[in-house]
Amino acid sequence: MKKKAGNLVIGIIFLAGLSLLLYPFVANQWNNYRQKQLISGYEQVVSEKEAAEGIDYDAERKKAEDYNEALLPCVLPDSFALAESSGVDPVYMNTLNIAGDEMMGSVEIPKINIKIPIYHTTEEEVLNKGAGHLEGSSLPVGGPSTHAVISAHRGLPSATLFTDL
């Protein structure tokens, strides 16, 4: 009886150790799958919205460029001070928010094999599920005197994100 109990304890310890060893791999695979699903869902919503009512991409781009121009005289804010502030600019949140889910697009880096969603803001909740755009920096539409800041975690045990950069 003691031998069975000892084998059971050893088996439980082995399974616990194996679980700890496999957790980062399994969690990373799950997050990669989830990010692909989110991006596919975003692209599908945008396609459906475009087919149903049409999306004026020129107007969306103009709105983003106007937002970027309004930032020109400003200094890039301190991201930590921004995180402590209570309000989020509604103009910012509604710009490049075509699907209405706060996702503004995705960033793909083929060399390191990542494709992750970009969300408005850099709050902890956002950075745990993808990349975040720093409010107060230029929106990522290009143009002169624009500097978009896209940030993501690196070194999370549950997701790769920007770990390989």
Question: What does each of the following model-derived ranges do?
Answer:
Residues 3-4, 10-165:
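Solvent-exposed, non-transmembrane regions of membrane-associated and secreted proteins
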